[in-house]
């Protein structure tokens, strides 16, 4: 699988409160959440994103509270993947479960606005406007299967482990 998009660069320790601040947590509408994505850092962020773009960050992306809404806001804003040096563990798991692709890489060479092409199978990121290739670590095994299904709920539905929103198939 190949992902190509423009990089939106952030620094270290981007926490879930910055990704989706508390006052916006009252809604369950994913598109409403997306309209406030990264509001704690850049209120205009959703207007800058084109479908398929990627977030690039430093260390400990998604730290802070375990709010799943942070991942939902990013995904429904149009972001296809987040590339970071490291992730908070709960954010990483929430990303897999929601169908947002977390990628671990040294992000120093990627600048805001660069066009990146990520090859998940080769585990490479090409900064196309610089003709530079960076190795990366992508989800594997069951994590990759869940992502391919579009998230955990879709994965479970395809496996016929859940019938509907009402519960687990017996």
Swiss-Prot record:
One of its GO terms (cellular component) is catalytic complex. GO terms for molecular function: aconitate hydratase activity; homoaconitate hydratase activity; maleate hydratase activity; protein homodimerization activity; zinc ion binding. InterPro entries: Aconitase/3IPM_dehydase_swvl (IPR015928), AconitaseA/IPMdHydase_ssu_swvl (IPR000573), IPMI_Swivel (IPR033940), LeuD (IPR050075), LeuD_type2/HacB/DmdB (IPR011827). Its EC number is 4.2.1.114. Pathway: Organic acid metabolism; 2-oxosuberate biosynthesis. Heterotetramer of 2 HacA and 2 HacB proteins. Cannot form a complex with LeuC. Component of a hydro-lyase with broad substrate specificity for cis-unsaturated tricarboxylic acids. Catalyzes both the reversible dehydration of (R)-homocitrate ((R)-2-hydroxybutane-1,2,4-tricarboxylate) to produce cis-homoaconitate ((Z)-but-1-ene-1,2,4-tricarboxylate), and its hydration to homoisocitrate ((1R,2S)-1-hydroxybutane-1,2,4-tricarboxylate). Is also able to hydrate the analogous longer chain substrates cis-homo(2)-aconitate, cis-homo(3)-aconitate, and even the non-physiological cis-homo(4)-aconitate with similar efficiency. This is Methanogen homoaconitase small subunit. The lineage of its organism: Archaea, Methanobacteriati, Methanobacteriota, Methanomada group, Methanococci.
């Amino acid at each position: 699988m190949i992902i190509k998009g423009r990089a939106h660069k952030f620094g270290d320790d981007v926490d879930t409160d910055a990704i989706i601040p508390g006052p916006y947590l009252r809604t369950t509408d994913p598109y409403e959440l997306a309209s406030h994505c990264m509001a704690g850092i850049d209120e205009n962020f959703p207007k800058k994103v084109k479908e398929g773009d990627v977030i690039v960050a430093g260390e400990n992306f998604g730290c802070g509270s375990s709010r799943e809404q942070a991942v939902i806001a990013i995904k429904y804003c149009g972001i296809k993947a987040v590339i970071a040096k490291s992730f908070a563990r709960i954010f990483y798991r929430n990303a897999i479960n929601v169908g947002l692709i977390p990628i671990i890489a040294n992000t120093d060479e990627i600048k805001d606005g660069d066009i990146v092409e990520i090859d998940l199978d080769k585990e490479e990121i090409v900064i196309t406007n610089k003709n530079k290739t960076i190795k990366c670590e992508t989800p594997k095994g069951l994590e990759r299967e869940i992502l391919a299904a579009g998230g955990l709920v879709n994965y479970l539905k395809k496996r016929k482990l859940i019938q509907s929103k009402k519960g687990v198939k017996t």
